[in-house]
Amino acid sequence: LASGSKLLPELRCCLELPYIERTSTMTAQEKIEEIKQRARKNFSLGYNCAECVTESVLSLIDTGLPSEVKKLATGFGGGIGLYGDTCGALVGAVMAVSAVHGRSSLPEGEGKEAAMKSKEQLYGKPGLYRLFNQIPNRFKAQNGHTLCRELTDKWQETWLCRDHALFCRELITGAAGIAAELILSDKDESASKPFGENVENLKE
């Protein structure tokens, strides 16, 4: 940087101290709020909805994954390349939680034994599907829908207007909060909760 150059506040804070180190002494609630505010700022910097959430979480939470994994979020913006499917912010939240609580390999074992262990890991109590099922259910409870086209229907003819951008910024902030809460809460407790919509009648 040239002498005397000025940085935007959000860029200055990131260069003064490594982000994870800077937030290492925060309480869980402070980290959740920091993640939400970073996601919010990301939108004004030019990140799309999915990128905003994944970048904010993965910049604070040390997953051991390379920073390049953030690139995986790009195509999900606007409900997958503006297709209007699942909201990009919601997908970003799922990706962020997966980066921490997802599976990198199957359980040890062979044949039917391995398959049964895998099924239990997903469907059991605790089970990963119980944890991830909370993300879309919480998002829908907050916003009424999970599909981009339904959330943004009133702006289909004025997609790039300010009101639409402000609306999506709130979705992004909320989705980042959902992801952060699930990551920073007790995993087994979160993964033992009842299923929500779609499989709410699945036997315990």
Describe the role of every protein-language-model region.
Residues 27, 66-69, 150-152:
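Active-site-adjacent bridging/hinge elements
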